[in-house]
């Protein structure tokens, strides 16, 4: 079983967007996928409720937010959307389950500083647990100074940058229908699929 955890201590950085897209990718590969939502806002769970029956199936993993247990048997791929403020013992408990951790980061100096200590803590715990960590830049406009600052910060961490995802209405419009870029005709989302390619390769590796 492959367990992917999406984590960042700050709210509003794109954790649910990334979680649902990753689940959608696994489902499009015809894996038995469960999406767990440990966040108080339950955005991923809401997204699942909007997902049409005609789309690749993704099952909801019902979680006790205070006690994250192992996923049910028969599942091949699990994606866990975690709450803001994740650290300490709770972070360690989550990482006991995880094979890979994906950290979304936005090109904002406030987000960067808020995430710095978390990445240091995460790297120490993950090294002991032999968990892989990857960073994804979210809502990035490559032409801006903020994007340059994000790139410089990420490079300084020594952690791998999987990709930079652009700021596009595609994610918002698809989320409103319970869908992902992997559920629609490729020609509609060519640029986005191109940005997802290195993430998908890392997830499959």
Locations of regions flagged by a protein language model:
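Hydrophobic anchor at the start of a short beta-strand
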Residues: 32-33, 78, 132-133, 161-162
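Structural beta-sheet core signal
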Residues: 35, 80, 103, 135-137
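NTP-binding/hydrolysis catalytic cores, primarily Walker-type P-loop NTPases
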Residues: 181-205
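Conserved C-terminal guanine-recognition region of P-loop GTPase G domains, centered on the G4
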Residues: 113-130, 138
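Conserved Switch II/interswitch segment of TRAFAC-class P-loop GTPases
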Residues: 98-117, 141-143
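P-loop/Walker-type NTP enzyme "switch/lid" segment
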Residues: 2-13, 20, 24-96, 175-183
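Beta-strand-loop-alpha "switch" segments that mediate conformational coupling across diverse proteins
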Residues: 141, 151-182
């Amino acid at each position: 079983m492959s367990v992917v955890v999406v984590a960042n201590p700050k709210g509003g950085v794109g954790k649910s967007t990334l979680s649902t897209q990753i689940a959608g990718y696994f489902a499009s590969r015809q894996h038995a996928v469960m999406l767990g939502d440990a966040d108080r806002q339950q955005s991923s769970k809401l997204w699942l409720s909007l997902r049409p029956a005609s789309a690749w199936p993704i099952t909801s993993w019902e979680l006790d937010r205070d006690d994250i247990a192992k996923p049910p048997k028969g599942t091949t791929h699990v994606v866990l959307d975690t709450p803001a403020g994740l650290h300490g013992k709770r972070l360690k408990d989550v990482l006991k389950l995880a094979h890979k951790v994906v950290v979304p980061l936005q090109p904002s100096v406030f987000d960067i500083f808020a995430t710095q200590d978390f990445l240091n803590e995460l790297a120490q715990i993950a090294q002991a647990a032999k968990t892989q960590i990857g960073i994804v830049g979210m809502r990035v406009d490559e032409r801006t100074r903020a994007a340059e600052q994000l790139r410089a910060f990420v490079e300084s961490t020594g952690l791998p940058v999987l990709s930079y995802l652009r700021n596009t209405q595609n994610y918002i419009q698809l989320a409103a229908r319970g869908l992902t870029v992997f559920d629609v005709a490729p020609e509609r989302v060519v640029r986005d699929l191109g940005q997802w390619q290195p993430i998908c390769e890392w997830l499959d590796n």
